[in-house]
Regions:
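Extracytoplasmic catalytic/substrate-binding loops of multi-pass membrane glycan-assembly enzymes
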Residues: 28-44, 53-68, 74-78
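Start-transfer (signal-anchor) and selected internal transmembrane alpha helices
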Residues: 1-25
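Membrane-interface transmembrane helices that cradle and orient dolichyl/undecaprenyl
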Residues: 100-101, 105-106, 141-156
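Transmembrane alpha-helices of multi-pass, membrane-embedded glycan-processing enzymes
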Residues: 66-70, 83-94, 134-137
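Membrane-interface alpha helices of multi-pass inner-membrane proteins
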Residues: 47-50, 111, 144, 153-158
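Short helix- or helix-capping micro-motifs
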Residues: 19-21, 111-117, 123
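Short acidic/glycine- and proline-prone juxtamembrane loop motifs at membrane-interface regions
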Residues: 126-133
Length: 158
């Protein structure tokens, strides 16, 4: 008997595989080919070590995240690139959950996988800066706003 489409379980498995491949590929490739961090990356780490409430050019969230992550897992290029890809994977996950609210499993999977061809989610995603941090923040914010309105629960607004 022929079935059309993929099941929700298969889609979740393929989405998990997609996240794993993306995370490994976009952590290894820049880690093997780039031997120094860009100036924004070094600036965020240096600022984050001070744990100040504000900085000259930017708000403190990103420097705090970078410094906290690198102090926890070690200061090296690999961990910085890994952090930038975790940021992108958080966005992919939020987009996946939101897409599942509207589309069948295969369509939601395609919606997320096709984002790999958008430069901000692939090769530009290796630079973690304030602009790229907004990719995950907007995705998560949009998801929670939708859930708050759809499910009428105050918890999603918090």
């Amino acid at each position: 008997m022929l079935t059309h489409g993929i099941t929700d379980r298969q889609a979740r498995g393929l989405f998990g595989l997609f996240l794993a491949v993306h995370l490994v590929m976009w952590t290894l490739l820049p880690g093997l080919t780039r031997h120094e961090l860009d100036s924004d990356s070094m600036m965020h780490f240096a600022w984050g070590q001070e744990w100040m409430g504000s900085y000259n050019l930017h708000p403190p969230l990103l420097p705090w995240i970078v410094a906290g992550f690198l102090q926890t897992f070690g200061v090296n290029n690999w961990n910085y690139v890994l952090l930038s890809q975790i940021n992108i994977c958080v966005a992919f996950t939020a987009i996946w959950v939101l897409a599942r609210q509207f589309f069948r499993p295969a369509q939601a999977l395609a919606a997320v996988c096709l984002l790999e061809f958008v430069p901000y989610y692939s090769f530009l995603g290796i630079r973690l800066n304030h602009t790229s941090l907004l990719i995950s923040l907007w995705a998560v914010g949009t998801l929670f706003a939708y859930l708050a309105v759809q499910r009428r629960r105050l918890i999603y607004w918090l």
